[in-house]
Amino acid sequence: MSLLDTVSRCEFLRAMPEALVARLEALAQIRTYPAGTELFIEGNAHPDFHIVAQGHVRLDMLVPQRGHIPILTAGPGDILAWSALVGNSVMTCTAVALEPVKTVAFPGHPLRQLCEAEHEVGFYVMRQLASAMSRRLLATRLQLLDLFADHVSALDLTPAIGHPGDPD
């Protein structure tokens, strides 16, 4: 399978016209990681943006007095290290391959330069990034609801004052 085939099969790039995917292919590298490998470490710089092509990656956060806590499992089509795409290469979690993993990696700085120079590429990339971040935020909200589900019934969630626009 060619690099273009691997890249174009990624959900992140599926909506992008083939000519634009070909522009990204010039930057893309296929990376493979054996099970148990740390792709990047929380607090460390990592310059590359990844799209998972095969396998699953666990994202952990270090919690004081508790150690590394799994927060999410990423699979095919999911993005990793998106901070590198927006100009902040310091990772907010640690990524560990749960099985053999293949990613399509893009160096963050050249990818940002391409997005800035070619606005159509930038539009597609940033639209997909926003969509992926929205899904990640929803997953986090659902985890928080699940975490606190036992405590919600014990709390009085009725506000002391009404919301703006509520009838008096």
Description of each model-found segment:
Residues 1-168:
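Cytosolic regulatory regions built on CNB/CRP/Popeye-like sensor folds
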